[in-house]
């Protein structure tokens, strides 16, 4: 535990940190990658270029300083980050490297003196121990689970299937022929790739898109115009090729009782964790109302529509509503989609106000902000709202 003087000293730096903004974390990452370039094989360097990771780390540092005397407030964020770290196979020695560069960054930017540096050193040590212990629990639990493993495991691509003009699904089976551990609906895999065309090893997280079966995993990947990994997977990786995976991770998953009504909301490739949730509900014979709301650019970008339709036929409590922003001539309203334009939840006002209904959603950040605002404006309590960001976490 931290003493009162250390807590007060760390809190005294909040105005300085806030005034500096993400310049602090930009300096930190630049320094760390210069002195420890091997870490480029762990971090998603695309998020370094667009600034998302710098902003996320800056927000995390400020949140830690502000709540250092009440760490329970940070537990949800710790859980999310710990799962992400476990998917990246982060080890205790990585925390020592990060701590060294964090303190050096504070010293180089502010020259705050030994008292502040010592306080931040103690504070970082406490936080690092929290993460190290939680991540070890995640690793150990995975090892003990039937079909589980620690670290990386080689898989082969069993099946590659086009799901839309921009989305391909990939089914992986372990090369050792063994079982694979179950996962919670909404969780993700990390895929590790190395290629001569890459500057570094690349690691990406992709949501699982089916129900657990003990023998294989399925994900879906959207081709991003500048995406190093997504284009490689779409264009280069074929059935029979090898990839390396860490075990399923993630703190965003369906967690409701059988009698709970639920609405699954998505846009674009954000439907991938919802597919896993929908298959789970079908597998469990969920008999309470299920609303499936999805937004796509048009029919050519609408993935998994046939799979969802098949599940819908088997579940009388299922109600699907689709929005196409710009339907093509061949997209038929009432058959392929119900509404044109952006997702307007007021058309389902009464259905969404079912008592005790939970809402899970995923998609582009602007879409999720738009959805969250509509739900809150309807009077939906925050405790019933759950969401997942692809990439560094943002508060919606």
Curated annotation (Swiss-Prot):
This is Flavohemoprotein. It comes from Photorhabdus laumondii subsp. laumondii (strain DSM 15139 / CIP 105565 / TT01). The active site is at residues 95, 135. GO terms for biological process: cellular response to nitrosative stress; nitric oxide catabolic process; response to toxic substance. It catalyses: 2 nitric oxide + NADPH + 2 O2 = 2 nitrate + NADP(+) + H(+); 2 nitric oxide + NADH + 2 O2 = 2 nitrate + NAD(+) + H(+). Consists of two distinct domains; an N-terminal heme-containing oxygen-binding domain and a C-terminal reductase domain with binding sites for FAD and NAD(P)H. Its EC number is 1.14.12.17. Residues 147-396 are annotated as: Reductase. InterPro entries: Cbr1-like_FAD-bd_dom (IPR008333), FAD-bd_FR_type (IPR017927), Flavoprot_Pyr_Nucl_cyt_Rdtase (IPR001709), FNR_nucleotide-bd (IPR039261), Globin (IPR000971), Globin-like_sf (IPR009050), Globin/Proto (IPR012292), Hmp (IPR023950). Is involved in NO detoxification in an aerobic process, termed nitric oxide dioxygenase (NOD) reaction that utilizes O(2) and NAD(P)H to convert NO to nitrate, which protects the bacterium from various noxious nitrogen compounds. Therefore, plays a central role in the inducible response to nitrosative stress. NADP(+) binds at residues 268-273. The record marks 84, 388 as: Influences the redox potential of the prosthetic heme and FAD groups. The lineage of its organism: Bacteria, Pseudomonadati, Pseudomonadota, Gammaproteobacteria, Enterobacterales. Residues 150-255 form the FAD-binding FR-type domain. FAD binds at residues 188, 204-207, 389-392.
